[in-house]
Swiss-Prot record:
It is found in: Cytoplasm. Catalyzes the hydrolysis of the 1-position phosphate from inositol 1,4-bisphosphate. Is also able to convert 3'(2')-phosphoadenosine 5'-phosphate (PAP) to AMP but with less efficiency. SUPFAM superfamilies: Carbohydrate phosphatase. One of its GO terms (molecular function) is inositol-1,4-bisphosphate 1-phosphatase activity. Optimum temperature is 60 degrees Celsius (with 3'(2')-phosphoadenosine 5'-phosphate (PAP) as substrate). Active between 30 and 80 degrees Celsius. This is Inositol polyphosphate 1-phosphatase. Partially inhibited by Li(2+). Optimum pH is 7.5 (with 3'(2')-phosphoadenosine 5'-phosphate (PAP) as substrate). It comes from the Eukaryota.
Length: 285
C-alpha cells in the first residue's frame, strides 16, 4: 500500500490533535495504576492511545504502530474526525510505502506530571521512521491550547522561540539531577528542572534549554523520536550519551528502551558534544 506524504502527515496531525483535545477536556476522576516497571498509567493514557490508533488504523489498517500502552483501536468509525488538510510549503509531496513506515506513540508523555497537575510537562508524542530513519515528529501540549509542533524531514511548523539565555541551560528532572557530573563545564551554565522526556526536548526546541543529558537506561523510543525529528530539523543533535544514533526497533518484542541513554544538544550547544562525550567515558551503561 502506498500513500502521499502530505496525506499521511495530515492523518497523523489529526490523530495527535484529537488525542490532545481529549486529554485537555478530561473531567472524570483520574484512576492511577502501576505497570510492571513501576511507572504510572491512567485511563487518560489509554483513551488517548485508542484515539490515535483508531484514526491512523482506519486509514492505514496494516501500518506498524508501536504504542507505549497495551491498547489499540476503540473508537467507532462513525465517530472519527474529518482529516485536517494542511499544506507544507515547498516540501515535496512524494509517494511513500506503508510497509516502510513505523509509528511510535506516547499518548501521554509525563503521566506522573499529569497526575500531580504539573501540566507544563505533559505532551502527546508521535514519531515516524521511514526505512529505518527518523522522518516525521509531531508533539502536542494539551494544556497550552493544544499547541502542535511538527517536523517532516527538514520542514518545520511555526515554533515560538524564547530569547537565548546568556548561560548554557541544562535540563533534567530533580530525581535524576546531573549537577555532580557537569561541575567542570567550561562556560557559565544553569540547571533547570522539568519532568517528561518530551517536555525536556521541547524546552530545547523552544530555546528554553540547551542540553538534555540522561545517562540512564530509562527513556524509550516513543519518548524521543517525535521531538528528535524536530530538533534535528532545527540543526540540533540527538544521540546516545556515547554519540551513537538512537535505535528504533520494529517490534515491541525487542527492547524499546535506549540502553545507552539520551543526549540532546541545541544548535548553539553542539560545540559541547566533545565535553559531554568525555563525561560519558566515566559512565558504564
Amino acid at each position: 500500500m502506498q500513500t502521499s506524504l502530505f496525506e499521511f502527515a495530515n492523518v497523523l496531525i489529526t490523530a495527535v490533535k484529537e488525542a490532545s483535545y481529549s486529554i485537555s477536556k478530561f473531567k472524570e476522576e483520574v484512576e492511577i495504576k502501576y505497570k510492571s516497571d513501576g511507572s504510572e498509567v491512567t485511563q487518560v493514557d489509554t483513551q488517548s492511545q485508542q484515539i490515535i490508533f483508531s484514526i491512523i488504523k482506519n486509514k492505514y489498517p496494516t501500518i506498524n504502530i508501536i504504542g507505549e500502552e497495551d491498547v489499540e483501536n476503540g473508537i467507532p468509525d462513525n465517530q472519527l474526525p474529518t482529516i485536517t488538510q494542511l499544506s507544507f510549503g515547498s516540501l515535496e509531496n512524494k509517494i511513500i510505502n506503508i510497509n516502510d513506515i513505523i509509528i511510535y506513540v506516547d499518548p501521554l508523555d509525563g503521566t506522573d506530571c499529569y497526575t500531580h497537575k504539573q501540566y507544563d510537562s505533559v505532551c502527546v508524542l508521535v514519531g515516524v521512521t521511514y526505512k529505518g530513519k527518523p522522518m516525521i515528529g509531531i508533539v502536542s501540549k494539551p494544556f497550552y491550547n493544544n499547541e502542535i509542533t511538527f517536523a517532516i524531514e527538514n520542514y518545520i511548523s511555526s515554533i515560538s522561540l524564547q530569547p537565548l539565555n546568556d548561560k548554557i541551560i541544562f535540563v533534567c528532572s530533580k530525581k535524576n539531577d546531573i549537577q555532580h557530573l557537569i561541575k567542570s563545564f567550561p562556560d557559565p551554565y544553569e540547571v533547570k528542572y522539568k519532568g517528561g522526556s518530551g517536555a525536556k526536548m521541547m524546552a530545547i526546541i523552544h530555546q528554553e534549554a540547551d542540553i538534555y543529558y540522561h545517562p540512564l537506561i530509562q527513556s524509550c523510543t516513543w519518548d524521543t523520536l517525535a521531538a528528535q525529528v524536530i530538533l534535528e530539523a532545527q540543526g540540533g543533535i540527538v544521540c546516545d550519551i556515547y554519540g551513537n544514533p538512537l535505535c528504533y526497533p520494529s517490534s515491541k518484542k525487542e527492547s524499546m528502551r535506549h540502553k545507552k541513554g539520551v543526549l540532546c544538544l541545541s544548535p548553539r550547544a553542539k560545540k559541547y558534544l566533545p565535553y559531554m562525550l568525555s563525561i560519558s567515558k566515566t559512565i558504564l551503561l
